[in-house]
């Protein structure tokens, strides 16, 4: 694994850091950008994911204009409805009931700002289908609290993975960072 001192990961996500390490990249610094993640009226999931990932990148870039800044944002949606990053059992229950037995989409955008002011962004959409969950399965998942802080209450890399019937797209993108797209962007500037 290589540590890139001039690369900042603009994220507090442990999953994103772990995924970066899978492609042999360790950022020199990790900064959690504090941005407003409010959903705009009539904003579609893909546009929201792109806007938030860019905002994270731009916030950190203002503080460190001479560094590369990598950011990402993951959004879970059912239809056009963007599901929240859940913080309460009530929110988690609502989201899990909504996606039970249905397909939902996961949009992840990865962005890289260069020291030269160039912005690279890639958006990946993955379709996930959950089995029809019983009341007992929903209750057990809610009790596990593995949904906390996750978009749409989904944590398929942990306990919720057993509910997935199919994935059409990028598994790593669902967890928070599309590896192929991230590698492709970083490989333009770093030897990985």
Swiss-Prot record:
GO cellular component: cytoplasm
Subcellular location, record wording: Cytoplasm
Main location as per UniProt: cytoplasm
Keywords, ordered alphabetically: Cytoplasm, Hydrolase, Nucleotide metabolism
Enzyme Commission number, as recorded: 3.6.1.9
A GO term for molecular function: nucleoside triphosphate diphosphatase activity
InterPro entries: ITPase-like_fam (IPR029001), Maf-like (IPR003697)
Reactions catalysed: a ribonucleoside 5'-triphosphate + H2O = a ribonucleoside 5'-phosphate + diphosphate + H(+); a 2'-deoxyribonucleoside 5'-triphosphate + H2O = a 2'-deoxyribonucleoside 5'-phosphate + diphosphate + H(+)
Active site: 73
Top-level EC class as recorded in UniProt: hydrolase
GO BP of this protein: nucleotide metabolic process
Cofactor(s) of this protein: a divalent metal cation
Record-linked Pfam families: Maf
HAMAP family found in the cross-reference section: Maf
Family: Belongs to the Maf family.
Main function: Nucleoside triphosphate pyrophosphatase. May have a dual role in cell division arrest and in preventing the incorporation of modified nucleotides into cellular nucleic acids.
Name of protein: Nucleoside triphosphate pyrophosphatase
Organism of this sequence: Ehrlichia canis (strain Jake)
């Amino acid at each position: 694994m290589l540590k890139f001192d001039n690369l900042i990961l603009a994220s507090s996500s442990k999953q994103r850091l772990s995924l970066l390490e899978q492609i042999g990249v360790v950022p020199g610094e990790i900064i959690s950008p504090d941005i407003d993640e409010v959903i705009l009226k009539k904003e579609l999931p893909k546009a929201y994911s792109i806007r938030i990932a860019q905002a994270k990148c731009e916030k950190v870039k203002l503080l460190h204009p001479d560094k590369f800044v990598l950011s990402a944002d993951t959004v879970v949606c059912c239809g056009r409805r963007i599901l929240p990053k859940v913080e309460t059992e009530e929110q988690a229950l609502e989201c899990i009931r909504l996606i039970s037995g249905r397909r939902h989409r996961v949009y992840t955008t990865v962005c890289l700002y260069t020291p030269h002011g160039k912005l690279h962004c890639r958006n990946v959409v993955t379709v996930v289908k959950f089995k029809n969950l019983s009341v007992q399965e929903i209750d057990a998942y809610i009790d596990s609290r593995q949904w906390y802080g996750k978009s749409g209450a989904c944590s398929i890399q942990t306990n919720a993975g057993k509910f997935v019937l199919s994935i059409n797209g990028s598994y790593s993108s669902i967890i928070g960072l599309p590896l192929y797209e991230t590698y492709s962007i970083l490989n333009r500037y770093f030897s990985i």
